[in-house]
């Protein structure tokens, strides 16, 4: 099975404070899901997420390998909106790539959040991927999941 192969190749790791951020979202009834350009299946990613972040309440996981589209194509975002039964203007999307995530979410009418966090002592294969890329629309740029918690706590409900 692909899960066995993927786990043997890389056991995965949790980004700092991701668990705390998910707890806060859950406590506030904020719905969550995943859209990934991953080549592994949604089933494999779900297994990994459930193992590494057992507190997650992701309603669904969408991967490129399951739908044959890659972000920034709005197709994946539209599928997610349809599954969630939500209008784009009610959704925020967090990702680490300006091209795939931020431009993709914006193109689908979703508010984009760029996460560019570093894990001390680890090599981040995504470091520098956004260098020199500029966009001409509003998005939230964070470097730590605690920043998102702070922003969300300031929004009146």
Residue ranges and their predicted role:
Residues 1-8, 41-45:
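Hydrophobic alpha-helical core bundles mediating ligand binding, dimerization, or RNAP-core interactions
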Residues 3-33:
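Short, acidic loop-to-helix structural element flanking the phosphoryl-transfer center
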């Amino acid at each position: 099975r692909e899960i066995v192969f993927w786990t043997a190749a890389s056991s995965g790791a949790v980004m700092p404070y991701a668990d705390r951020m998910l707890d806060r979202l859950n406590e506030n009834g904020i719905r969550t899901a995943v859209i990934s350009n991953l080549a592994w299946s949604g089933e494999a990613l779900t297994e990994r997420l459930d193992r590494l972040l057992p507190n997650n309440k992701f309603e669904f996981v969408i991967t490129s390998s399951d739908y044959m589209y890659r972000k920034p194509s709005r197709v994946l975002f539209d599928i997610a909106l349809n599954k969630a039964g939500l209008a784009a203007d009610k959704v925020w999307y967090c990702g680490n790539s300006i091209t795939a995530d931020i431009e993709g979410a914006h193109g689908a009418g979703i508010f984009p959040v760029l996460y560019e966090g570093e894990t001390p002592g680890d090599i981040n294969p995504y470091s520098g991927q956004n260098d020199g890329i500029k966009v001409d629309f509003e998005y939230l740029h964070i470097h730590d999941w605690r920043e998102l918690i702070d922003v969300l706590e300031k929004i009146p409900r």
